């Protein structure tokens, strides 16, 4: 087994040598010295690259800034059968990754995760919000949405096989790379295990952290929502449409009595918007499933949207709505433009118009995400061999 250790780096001159040294200790202990340390440099200007090379690492430049881009550069440049990733700030002791390497190398799992929450966290090593809010909530969402039994989705120390890396097709360049790895591991059917690791305090008190709590937390959450549209959009949308669609139709026809309680046109002011919100949530589900494929994030290909049918249905619904409105205006004109009670008919017309407009606009937008483009830099066909 050949072992590679991938370390992302951006201006970590004061700690990179220590991190590389710990990584080399891991290679010696877990792989008998058969391995390498590869640093993905994100454009450091403080001499980090030179210090990493001096410590015995090979440096792979990452052209684009970002945690994910730096790791991808290091992993793609590595040659090991098993890859360990960890940070350059020496807050992780790479020597603790030996059980992770053993689990992957033995075939008992494809991706071995570290867990700071199950291990030891030095005082001051992890911000309060990260430890008690951000990481637990995001980890719960991953357990709930994707069925992975993990406690620390943001732990930076992980080990995985080369085959697992290729099957995950990782593309995210920011901090959400950590969540992408877990989501795609689940979608690819990879076996994931978790091991306790320690988190040490960063002694450089004057260092500006690369991690931004709220911005990066939102990036993680946004990515998880994108890959769980069935829970976030489809389920609530279907419930709203199933409940308030019939309610809206019934109240547009007349008052309804349920269990001795009268429901009249006043309740249309709740039913109509909730029904329309339900429709839009279902369209958001269609957007999300198609955008994943459009952006190269993977996932199961959705059924193709019959654009022409949705356009026709939308236009027909809109025309019927306009016809109902026209009837109201005709009656109002016939009554001498005086007071006219037409709340039910106007509500029905409004629902039809909104449904038609939502169908047409969303169908057009969704169909755009189904287009396939050929890069101008890539040949459409390969030239014939001589």
Locations of regions flagged by a protein language model:
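Short, acidic, metal-binding catalytic loop of nucleotide-sugar glycosyltransferases
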Residues: 21-33
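Hydrophobic helical membrane-anchoring modules
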Residues: 170-386
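A conserved hydrophobic helix/loop-capping motif in glycosyltransferases and polysaccharide synthases
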Residues: 3-12, 19, 26, 40, ...
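Acceptor/aglycone-binding surface of glycosyltransferases and processive sugar-polymer synthases
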Residues: 62-77, 82, 94-175, 202-223, ...
């Amino acid at each position: 087994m050949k072992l590679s250790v991938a370390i992302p780096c951006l201006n970590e001159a004061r700690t990179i040598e220590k991190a590389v040294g710990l990584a080399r200790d891991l290679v010696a202990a877990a792989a008998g010295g058969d391995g390498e340390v590869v640093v993905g440099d994100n454009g450091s200007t403080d001499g980090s690259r030179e210090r990493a090379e001096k410590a015995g690492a090979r440096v792979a430049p990452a052209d684009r800034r970002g945690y994910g881009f730096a790791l991808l550069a290091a992993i793609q440049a590595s040659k090991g059968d098993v890859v360990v990733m960890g940070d350059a700030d020496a807050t992780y002791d790479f020597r603790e990754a030996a059980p992770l390497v053993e689990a992957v190398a033995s075939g008992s799992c494809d991706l071995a995760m570290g867990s700071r929450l199950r291990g030891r966290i030095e005082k001051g090593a992890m911000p309060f919000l990260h430890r008690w809010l951000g990481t637990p909530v995001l980890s719960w969402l991953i357990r709930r949405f994707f069925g992975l039994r993990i406690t620390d989705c943001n732990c930076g120390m992980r080990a995985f096989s080369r085959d697992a890396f290729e099957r995950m097709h990782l593309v995210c360049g920011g901090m959400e790379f950590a969540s992408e790895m877990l989501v795609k591991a689940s979608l690819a059917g990879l076996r994931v295990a978790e091991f306790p690791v320690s988190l040490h305090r960063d002694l450089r008190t004057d260092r500006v952290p690369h991690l931004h709590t709220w911005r990066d937390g939102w990036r993680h959450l946004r990515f998880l929502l994108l890959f769980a549209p069935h829970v976030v959009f489809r389920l609530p949308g279907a419930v709203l449409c199933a409940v308030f669609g019939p309610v809206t139709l019934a109240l547009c026809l007349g008052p309804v009595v349920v269990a001795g309680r009268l429901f009249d046109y006043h309740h249309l002011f709740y039913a109509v918007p909730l029904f329309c919100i339900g429709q839009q949530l279902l369209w958001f589900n269609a957007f999300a499933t198609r955008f994943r494929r459009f952006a190269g994030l993977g996932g199961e290909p959705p059924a193709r949207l019959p654009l022409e049918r949705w356009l026709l249905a939308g236009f027909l619904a809109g025309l019927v709505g306009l016809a109902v409105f026209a009837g109201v205006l005709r009656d109002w004109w016939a009554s001498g433009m005086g007071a006219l009670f037409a709340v039910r008919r106007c509500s029905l017309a409004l629902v039809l118009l909104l449904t038609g407009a939502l169908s047409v606009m969303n169908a057009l937008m969704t169909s755009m995400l189904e287009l396939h483009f050929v890069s101008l830099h890539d040949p459409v066909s390969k030239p014939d061999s001589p």
